[in-house]
Amino acid sequence: MPSLTAFFGGTFDPIHYGHLQPVTALAKLVGLTQVVLMPNNVPPHRQQPEASSRQRFHMAELAVEGNPLFTVDDRELQRQTPSYTIDTLEALRAEKGHDAPLGFIIGQDSLLTLHHWHRWQDLLGVCHLLVCARPGYRSTLETPELQQWLDDHLTHAPEDLHQQPHGRIFLADTPLVTISATDIRQRRQQGLDCHDLLPPVVLRYINEHGLYQ
């Protein structure tokens, strides 16, 4: 069976250690050898990122340059209109074939609101969900029915993620990193130091392009 590939989407405005450190820890926990970062195309009716699509993509590339675990995929940024997560995952599944194990990485905060996503009940028919812990969020879902859905698909065995192409949920005990892109943008606007929040090469790019001022 092909090796497990995991996809991790985000605005990455900018990418920072709060993205990279938990996902790196997750990769070690479950034996991932490939994580694909996918910067999001933000819908026009939502607040737009402060950095352009290309700048967000380039910062993601810089952040993982030389790290064999990560690659960056710009397919979402190439779209003329934003798409639902399930659409992207179904396209990836079609590319990879029926038998390839696919994972989609989300934070604990997203798991708690997953039932509001478009066609959320179809997600596990396409991929596994790999969930990174997030500070300050509860560990149970909103209703008994949702909790039962989680319990029915939950696995504590990483090998399940490699031996099955989709259908499992893995709750990873990853480091709780209290860094957010909002905090970084605010610190930049206040002239505060950010060197411990994101890779030096990304901070250098931000400085050179005058971002988040």
Swiss-Prot record:
E.C. number(s) listed in UniProt: 2.7.7.18
Q: Which reaction does it catalyse?
A: nicotinate beta-D-ribonucleotide + ATP + H(+) = deamido-NAD(+) + diphosphate
**A single BP term in Gene Ontology:** NAD biosynthetic process
Q: List the disulfide bonds.
A: none
Q: What molecular function terms (GO) are annotated for this protein?
A: ATP binding; nicotinate-nucleotide adenylyltransferase activity
Main enzyme class: transferase
Q: What pathway is it annotated to? A: Cofactor biosynthesis; NAD(+) biosynthesis; deamido-NAD(+) from nicotinate D-ribonucleotide: step 1/1
Give the record's keywords alphabetically: ATP-binding, NAD, Nucleotide-binding, Nucleotidyltransferase, Pyridine nucleotide biosynthesis, Transferase
Tell me where on the tree of life, at the top rank, the source sits. Answer: Bacteria
Cited function: Catalyzes the reversible adenylation of nicotinate mononucleotide (NaMN) to nicotinic acid adenine dinucleotide (NaAD).
The record's listing under HAMAP family reads: NaMN_adenylyltr
The family line of this record is:
Belongs to the NadD family.
Q: Which PANTHER family match?
A: NICOTINATE-NUCLEOTIDE ADENYLYLTRANSFERASE-RELATED (PTHR39321), PHOSPHOPANTETHEINE ADENYLYLTRANSFERASE (PTHR39321:SF3)
Q: What is the protein name for this chain?
A: Probable nicotinate-nucleotide adenylyltransferase
Gene behind the chain:
nadD
